[in-house]
Amino acid sequence: MSGSVYLRDERAHLISENECMTDKPFTRRLCSCCSYAAVRKRLPILNWLPQYSLQWLKLDLIAGLTVGLTVVPQALAYAEVAGLPVQYGLYSSFMGCFVYCVLGTSKDITLGPTAIMSLLCASYIDHDPVYAVLLTFLCGIIQCVTGILHLGFLLDFISFPVLKGFICAAAITIGFGQVKNILGIHNIPQQFVLQVYYTFLRIHETRVGDVTLGLICILILLCLKFMKGHMKSTEPNTSFLVKSCCTIIWFFATARNAVVVLSAAVVAFVFTDHNLDVFTLTGKTAKGLPPFRPPFFSEKTENETLSFKDITEDLGAGLAVIPLMGLLESISIAKAFGSENDYRIDTNQEILAIGLTNILGSFVSSYPVTGSFGRTAVNSQTGSCTPAGGLVTGSVVLLSLAYLMPLFYYIPKAALASVIICAVLPMFDYTIFKKLWKVKKMDLLPFLLTFIMCFWEIQYGIVAGVILSSFILLYRVSRPQIQTILKSNLKACE
């Protein structure tokens, strides 16, 4: 889908506004809001749907199916990071596909659970699905208000060094958090420092089967990723057999997460069928589609009933950090792929799309979602033409929920851990230290502060980084570089 579609719509919207300039102010505003161009601005599907072709349909089907095979195993794994039962990863993976198809302005981006959002959620929900779903609803409300009031500029307060510091710390935290599943060790604390301590303290409890399977899965995933990155495009005169082999290799490399998880599940089933307890399995999961219902605004526990006020107090800073980071992650990805593929996105419309996805997602037991860089890259590389590919991806997830949930019992936790570890490895940018040192040494301070403090508490790391970054900015603004030009020098120049 070319960027010209959006450019024509912007011109049409401006023309319709100019036609109303001769009317009264209220009539002018009403005319602007009710014009067809304004409706198309709020419903971007109307921009590309009239031009939809069979060629686009073919490419969107391929892209949607490929992303679907990627998101199912990732969703199961990310639910583990969020501290929720694995089915909640799938509950969070389909609503964004349908909502974004109607409201999104990027042809490439896919919404769903991500490693970073899962880690953020785990910091606030304490393994409680009720907290997770209510957090999703409140995040959606906050994001929609941000979009309606055009408050997207607030994202600029999180500077590049702060964002990079958080992402690098998150990559280490998420990756090390899965070491316990690779080793087959249980009941490890969630806090990072305690996690490191108790993992090494109880390393003697390592299960050989889990370690062996986990390392093999990691090796296969890395090899398949390497093969995909080094595949060359076939020449026109290449034989049919060679083209077929290249296509098969490309498919397996692209859907490597699904291939590895499925293969590991088959191996685990064989061992379990022979009464051999070799691997730590995912275990029983809820069957079928999630019920469509509003989130619970209170929760009954064994000792007390938690009110809406109690839950929001427990969520605390998460009500600010999670919606803000979700918007920042998604919009950064959308802008990057829009620039790469030569089209523009509407930032405020993107914010509304993400917000509405989270609001509606809370009605199907989703936890907060955002744009996924990995799946967006897959979507773009497989030739998606419109957001319609999301309909196929969402359908794949729904079919998995409807028919495959009993089979997820046999998925080893070590296999899911390997998927997560390989997904977060590229998130750690080891070159960022050198880049910041060369470009602007002072930016290393907020980067390092955010990076270090995020190992203690994520929200403290982000807030501390933003505050320090703001102080540095104010310091530079308050001390501008002024050059004094003497009058004698001016005469000499003349």
Question: Regions from the language model: what does each represent?
Answer:
Residues 488-494:
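Solvent-exposed, non-transmembrane loop/terminal regulatory segments of multi-pass membrane proteins
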Residues 2-488:
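Transmembrane helical cores of multi-pass ion-transport proteins
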